[in-house]
C-alpha cells in the first residue's frame, strides 16, 4: 500500500506515535518490532483519509503496540525514515514521518501480535533504535527521543552506564 504524499514534501508521508510513560524522574518509550522483526521502531503507518494525522498515529499505537492514552493533536517533530534494503525488489523507500507524542495510560495485547511491544528507558531506546540502521537514519530516530524528552520536560541521562 502506498502512502499519501503531503504536497509540502517530495516523499510519501507517514505518522508515528511516540509512546512514552513517566517512571519516577525519567521517561520510558514503547517500541515495536519492524515487520521483518529485526529492528525496533515507533508505531507508525500511513495517514488515513477520514482521520486527522494525530488520530491516525493514535490508531497505529493501538494496532501495533496495544497502547492507549493521550495523544497530542500536533506533531512535535518531523523525521526521515527508510524501509527496505537496496538488494530487494523495490529497493529502499524513504518517508517523511510526522511524530506525535502519546502519554500511554494503558496497554493490552496489540492487534499485530508479532510486534512485541516493549518499554525501554530513553538511553536504551536511543541505542536500540540505531541498531542495524544506516548512520543517517539511526541519527534521525535518536533525535526523535531527544526531542521527545525536551518536549515532555525530562532531562536526558548520560549514557555512562
Where are the regions a protein language model picked out?
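Acidic, metal-coordinating catalytic segment for phosphate/diphosphate chemistry
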Residues: 1-25
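Active-site segment of metal-dependent pyrophosphate-handling enzymes
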Residues: 62, 66-107
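Short, charged/polar surface micro-motifs in flexible loops or helix N-caps
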Residues: 23-25, 36-39, 48-49, 80-83, ...
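Conserved hydrophobic/aromatic beta-strand scaffold that supports enzyme active sites
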Residues: 18, 31, 99-101, 119
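Short, solvent-exposed loop/turn segments that connect beta-strands within catalytic domains
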Residues: 22-28, 89-92
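Conserved Nudix-box catalytic region and its N-terminal flanking loop in Nudix hydrolases
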Residues: 26-68
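Nudix hydrolase/Nudix homology domain
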Residues: 38-39, 107-161
